[in-house]
Regions:
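A glycine-rich beta-strand to alpha-helix segment
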Residues: 175-197
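Carbohydrate-associated surface elements
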Residues: 167
Length: 197
């Protein structure tokens, strides 16, 4: 059985110990039922480390970081700008976008968007869990909810924006994207963009 992977936001140094958060402690003790001496892989944007549980009680777990097993990787320059949808579909979108390696997610409000808020704490939790499960190192950055017109006006000239327009004659070609170019993929609301948008 492979080691479980957990996101660790603090810096990790080899041969140091760390007391884990209540959330990680609960997961290790009550959900995974690991024992002292068990190995866990911790990761962050700097890489992935093998650790060993050196102290374990019901409400306290301490690990020792043994060695770095994976170097940090180059993150993609892909932003998913998506109009907010209902809770369950939005959570699936956050999960799948993370698994596909999107580096940034920007929730958008357009004229026809029915949902106006995103629970940022929940969204971050979903993306961190998806990062743990998909063997990635970097959860995507989740930007604050932004109005469509503000998002469009702040697009950098170096960034390529893609969106579907059923009335357009233009069809995207692979040559439209240069290697390592920043791109944004804009997904409209359930009722499509308004004619003014």
């Amino acid at each position: 059985m492979s080691n479980i992977r957990l996101f660790f936001s603090d810096n990790i140094l080899e041969n140091t110990t760390s007391l884990l958060s209540k959330e990680h402690t609960h997961y290790i003790v009550n959900v995974m039922r690991l024992k002292r001496g068990s190995n866990i892989n911790f990761f962050n944007k700097e890489g992935e480390w093998l650790s060993e549980i050196v102290f374990l009680e019901r409400d306290r777990v301490e690990v020792k970081f043994l060695n770095k097993i994976k170097e940090s990787s180059i993150t993609s320059n892909i932003e998913l700008a998506i109009c907010l949808v209902k809770k369950t579909p939005m959570e699936i979108i956050l999960q799948k976008a993370t698994e596909l390696g999107v580096s940034r997610i920007t929730p958008i409000i357009s004229e026809r968007t029915e949902v106006k808020e995103l629970n940022l704490e929940r969204a971050i939790k979903i993306t961190v869990e998806a990062t743990e499960q998909s063997n990635q190192l970097n959860p995507p950055v989740i930007n604050k909810v932004t109005k469509l017109k503000d998002f469009i006006s702040n697009i950098n000239q170096d960034k390529k924006l893609f969106f579907a327009d059923i009335n357009s004659e233009y069809r995207m070609k692979p040559a439209d994207i240069k290697k390592n170019q920043s791109i944004s993929i804009l997904i409209g609301p359930e009722g499509d963009f308004s004619s003014q948008e």
